[in-house]
Amino acid sequence: QGLLYVDSTGSRFFNEELTIDWPQASNAIARTGEWTYIVFDEATKREFSTEGKGYPNPCGNFIQRHQAATQLDALLKANEAKGNVFIGNTIEEVAKKAGMDPATLKASADMMTKFAKQGRDDQFGKDKYYLRAVSEGPFYVVRGKLNTLTSLNGVKVNADLQVLDKN
């Protein structure tokens, strides 16, 4: 919730607070295509690594609520080697590494920093508790795919999960 989500162009596309509610988040994220990107700066990484944060489900099992993510540096480095994390000293550098337009990602980061400083999200109305500046390098971009964690309705099945209707 406290992190900036962008699409493959570097544009912020929804209120990240919705990640608390997976069905709503999934619908917003699905429109971005195959990949979604989470962007944060060194100050946020340091806070998660040393203090933890009280966000509900900040990154599933990756970062636990109210617990320091002492493994965060190692996880970022390991996933950088796999091509799922990009690290750059400037927002433009990390954008290029992630294949995004540097000006677009910079505009998204600058806008989020402005919202964090003013305590109000003028774009999507995210609660001020979750607003985080993206201004202190190095910068991190984590690439992820949408996973379906819940479903609404679907096929009718019996107690053995056998489909009841051929349609």
Region locations from a protein language model:
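An anion/pyrophosphate-binding glycine-rich loop and adjacent beta-alpha core
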Residues: Q1-K97
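A glycine-rich dinucleotide-binding beta-alpha-beta segment and adjacent secondary-structure elements
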Residues: T104-N167
